[in-house]
């Protein structure tokens, strides 16, 4: 099967549902015979970007590195699923420009919903001051103004979110319907 490479970049607050959507989309794509790789922000931080902190500069470096790897894979015909908070709009635009074949997916859920879903207790630690610079609490998240797809995970089921991304990939001829 001939396939075009594309990076599908899922951005949103911690707990919004990026990883859940990524895994469901990964399964659907693999079951359909597509070659793909998943770059999860948490996994990347323990390997490729180990040693980086959470300053704006380090976060930008982290996203640039994920973008570089995504670009290499995309230009070689691989579908890349990136699941990363990527809180700053400017760096998301930079990697979009670098990669070219790029879909921005805004995984959108209200902060209160993300806090309710927080099994690691990170939001509570951020609110108590135990964690500093936590996105959405004391560090900004700049939502995309014009994403290719928006998934409202507080209002729609997982299958609907995956279906919206799938349909966009079909519409843009990255995959067959």
Curated annotation (Swiss-Prot):
Keywords: ATP-binding, Kinase, Nucleotide-binding, Phosphoprotein, Transferase
Keyword Membrane: no
Catalytic reaction list: adenosine 5'-phosphosulfate + ATP = 3'-phosphoadenylyl sulfate + ADP + H(+)
UniProt xrefs under Pfam families: APS_kinase
GO BP: hydrogen sulfide biosynthetic process; sulfate assimilation, phosphoadenylyl sulfate reduction by phosphoadenylyl-sulfate reductase (thioredoxin)
Residues the entry annotates as binding ATP: 12-19
EC annotation from Swiss-Prot or TrEMBL: 2.7.1.25
Residues at the active site: 86 (phosphoserine intermediate)
Keyword presence, Transmembrane: no
Pathway note: Sulfur metabolism; hydrogen sulfide biosynthesis; sulfite from sulfate: step 2/3
GO molecular function: adenylylsulfate kinase activity; ATP binding; sulfate adenylyltransferase (ATP) activity
InterPro entries listed in its UniProt record: APS_kinase, P-loop_NTPase, Sulf_AdTrans/APS_kinase
HAMAP family assigned to the protein according to its UniProt record, in alphabetical order: Adenylyl_sulf_kinase
Function: Catalyzes the synthesis of activated sulfate.
Stated family: Belongs to the APS kinase family.
Full protein name: Probable adenylyl-sulfate kinase
